[in-house]
Amino acid sequence: MIGTRLSILYASQMPASPPRFGAQARMHGLMSELGRRHDLTAVVLIDDEFDADECRAAMMAYCRDVIVVPNPYGRDGLAKRLLQARSLASVHSYERMRVTVPALQEVLDRVLTERRFDIVNLVFPNLGHLNFDQFPAGEKRPRLVVDSHEIAYDLARQYSETGGTAVRRLYAQANWRKLRHDELGSYRRADGVYLCSVADERRLLDEAPGARTAVVPNAADVDYFQPRATDPPADGRTLVYFGLLSTTPNIDGVTHFVRDIWPHISSAHPDSRIKIIGGRPPPSLHALAGPQVSLTGFVDDLRPHLAAAAVLVVPLRLGGGTRLKIVEAMAMGKAIVSTSLGAEGIDAVAGRDILIADDPSSFAAAVNGLLADPARAAEIGRSARRVAVEKYSWSGAARSLEAFYGTVLEAAA
């Protein structure tokens, strides 16, 4: 089945390319590999965060057709706030309501009745309530497959207990059970669900024991993310954190690091600094900036920043899935200090390929040890690079997904 050329429809709440944050990087990595061997059509929602023409052109590099549908609900602003308020009175989650766009269903109706597909792949379960049962006369129904990315309702539950302001926690408490209902409904409707980690797969199977599942790990372009002779050398004092800074796990992780961990590092290494890289940081993160703490905003190329870093820090306390930031830094040959949750799903040996620490003092001690011993940091980085090349390339991840497509199609034969 893997050798069969498939016709695949990707439906997503965001474009895959150009990839600027983790969810896009997963989509881009898998789709660009699959596009080498299969016929891809993409239907994507585009909100005010993206340039529709730029995104469509970038995705046409590996798709036969890309159809963009404007989403009236922006990432920020009045429309988003009004929708959030409406969701409080709804039986459905905000995440589902945000992608319930009539124009999207109209496009899906047309594409699915005009063209034959073997697989309909939903990127995120939020679209699972839409109608994907149409198909041309005389053809078989395409199989519905969902890329989970993360168990979103579990993240929302975590946030309702420990994250953010009191108002945000109250909103999460009101929303997460509705999100659980909507998300599990999508998984149960699907012919197959693939997830980023074994831990997430277990969580799903606990809730939906009959689901057909597979693990398709996050990965990296190990040829793009690799040490280069032209990169600046690591300066021995710079720490780096990167990610989309508008997301709850990243906001919490950065805040926790700067407030609770950073003082233990800066006192031991007064010349050290932390560089926080990523788009859309909220005012609360800007307020943390200082002489030794800088926010760069979004950068087009992470590699020079990673190359110059002595250590990548991943102080995450919330979230699911697996962290693309870790895999990309491993591919760059960097020493990484992470919490257990941050490294969840990464098949790396603690102490050899990565350092794991869960409380502020031990996290700071791990970082301080690497800053004091550059040779050990370099050794861990080399070992991390080997793991990334052997286990976390997008080509390998795409082959795993192709095998899962085959399993789903064979079950329907």
Residue ranges and their predicted role:
Residues R143, Y153, A172-P227, A234:
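Donor nucleotide-sugar binding/catalytic pocket of nucleotide-sugar-dependent glycosyltransferases
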